[in-house]
């Protein structure tokens, strides 16, 4: 039997990206680490900063809930979220966030932002990601990996699903993941893996890419 795989045109990809971008955020994690002074033997503290992407997955009457990788928020003293929408005042795009829940075994975390901290202008432009069903995926389906980590800028790559339920071990914990040849990097880690309809089917994990086959990206199925 013939096997038909829908192929996205450049126009389709642009349209999916345009629809998805308002649900993609940049997350900055500021922490503090101890550093021993070489001269006096005293302990000094040094600020650290790391960045990743996140996906708006729900909106309640009080807050926005954002999915990301656990390693993006791990050890955070201070978290901030930057929304990727055009704003009249650029300061409005960056707000403080709190970790709502973590699952280190699956490298997933949920971050919350109070709606009261987000201007009405920004709120009106944000979108909640449309959930897909990773159980319906087939090898050969086209996918889009999208993210917006600060320091990397907007990152979009297109590829195909290479394998499903691929066992990947990170920090001695094994998980079944979606394997794709779409590049998953620190620019889109924590961001969205979308199907050909623009629905969210996975959360990209650059940490998994470090441990896997070269040229292969991995996403945590949703």
Regions found by a protein language model. Give the residues of each.
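Serine-dependent protease modules
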Residues: 1-222
């Amino acid at each position: 039997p013939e096997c038909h795989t829908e192929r996205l045109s450049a126009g389709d990809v642009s349209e999916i990206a345009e629809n998805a971008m308002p649900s993609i955020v940049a997350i900055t994690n500021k922490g503090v680490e101890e550093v021993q002074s070489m001269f006096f033997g005293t302990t000094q503290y040094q600020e650290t900063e790391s960045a990743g992407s996140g996906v708006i997955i729900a909106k309640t009457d009080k807050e926005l809930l954002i999915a990301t990788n656990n390693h993006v928020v791990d050890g955070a003293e201070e978290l901030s979220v930057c929304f990727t929408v055009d704003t009249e005042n650029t300061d409005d795009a960056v707000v403080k966030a709190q970790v709502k829940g973590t699952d280190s075994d699956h490298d997933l975390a949920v971050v919350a932002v109070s709606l009261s901290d987000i201007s009405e202008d920004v709120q009106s432009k944000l979108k909640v990601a449309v959930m897909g069903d990773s159980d319906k995926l087939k090898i050969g389906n086209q996918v889009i990996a999208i993210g917006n980590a600060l320091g990397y800028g907007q990152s979009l790559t297109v590829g195909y699903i290479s394998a499903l339920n691929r066992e990947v071990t990170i920090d001695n914990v094994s998980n079944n993941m979606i394997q794709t040849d779409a590049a998953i990097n620190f620019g889109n880690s924590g961001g969205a893996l979308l199907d050909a309809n623009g629905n969210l089917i996975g959360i990209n994990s650059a940490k998994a890419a470090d441990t896997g086959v070269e040229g292969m990206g991995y996403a945590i199925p949703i």
